[in-house]
Amino acid sequence: LTKERSASLMTIFGGFLYIFLRIDKFKYKIISLFLAALLIIISISTVPDTFKRFKFIYNSEQNLLDTQWGAHFLTSYEIFKKNPIIGSGIRTYRFECSKDYLKNINSKAAELRCSTHPHNFYLEILSDTGILGIGFFLFFLLQVLKKIIFFYKQKITDNNLIISICLFSVFFWPLKTTGSIFSSWNSYFYILSLIVILYQINFIKLKLR
């Protein structure tokens, strides 16, 4: 997903997820989600400038892999294949991307493959730190996800917890373009969302005792 598509879809996804988690009865979940979707469609279609912008963002017929973002993704994967265990090193994408073995990646935008990072932090971790780094990272996220699923099964509807779950889900959704997780500015938001959700989980645990 490009940046604009990613931002708009993640906003919608976060809103829908909040409705799904906040409302208890399944029937009301469906009704609320339908009404929210209807409201979005009406809002987009009745405001001419918004509708034109929406069409421009989503009507692209270009294959994702033939965009500059697709070139970044393919490049990071090839870097990982060359350094599968420990990766090429943190924040080395900018140096690796210009090397000759990456000139023939399967993308029409191969000449645009170089950047400071691959614009998806999962791929960034994979190419920079290899299987070891991504394995540790995914293990940690899975532990958080297990706690979220546990609280969902307990039908806990604490509003602060639900908001933190939505933020966590939006920030760590894998299928989107992102900033670099190893830059101080971007990593701040990822770390903050983790701190918030872990705090809320522990806070709810204490309340249940």
Regions found by a protein language model. Name each.
Residues 2, 6, 40-47, 137-141, ...:
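Alpha-helical transmembrane segments
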Residues 1, 5-8, 21-27, 55, ...:
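Juxtamembrane transmembrane-helix termini
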Residues 1-21, 47, 130-133, 179-180:
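Helix-loop-helix junctions and helix-breaking kinks within/between transmembrane helices
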Residues 1-2, 22-65, 74-82, 90, ...:
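A membrane-periplasm/extracellular boundary helix in multi-pass inner-membrane enzymes
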